[in-house]
């Protein structure tokens, strides 16, 4: 999607989508698919990691005027004893103010945070529009500052 190059992405969800698209195409339906962002989530014992899109090096190599934004994202209101921090890294295009990639590492909710990043990358939603997204908030289930809203606060001045 971001590089217009073929991408090796041996993931089950990508294979399932490719199968559905092929079936629709073979049945005569008009279908298209722009490709995958290479989104994945994994874990090593209690540590979880999820990544999508381009790394900073990849973005620069493909000609983007890219930079990195790092932040901490709590899994719930930080007043709760069992709230855990996740590290979030977002790669963005400084010229167009759109996200190009993201990585989330931590103990909980990394795939959920990353799915939101993948959506805004896929649809090229500009950072300035993040303030318009109505994120769910509950002190026991999420932080009041979603990572996309933190990106908005840091990048739109």
Predicted ranges, named:
Residues 46-52, 61-157:
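Flexible, glycine-rich terminal cap/loop adjacent to redox cofactors
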């Amino acid at each position: 999607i971001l590089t217009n190059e073929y991408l090796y992405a041996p993931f089950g969800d990508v294979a399932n989508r490719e199968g559905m698209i092929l079936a629709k195409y073979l049945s005569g339906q008009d279908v298209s698919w722009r490709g995958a962002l290479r989104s994945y989530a994994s874990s090593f014992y209690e540590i979880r990691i999820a990544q999508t899109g381009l790394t900073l090096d990849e973005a620069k190599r493909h000609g983007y005027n890219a930079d990195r934004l790092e932040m901490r994202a709590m899994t719930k209101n930080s007043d709760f004893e069992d709230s855990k921090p996740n590290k979030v890294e977002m790669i963005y295009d400084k010229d167009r103010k759109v996200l190009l990639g993201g990585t989330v590492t931590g103990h909980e909710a990394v795939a959920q945070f990353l799915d939101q990043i993948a959506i805004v990358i896929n649809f090229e939603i500009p950072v300035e529009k993040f303030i318009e997204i109505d994120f769910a908030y509950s002190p026991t289930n999420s932080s009041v500052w979603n990572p996309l809203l933190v990106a908005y606060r840091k990048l739109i001045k």
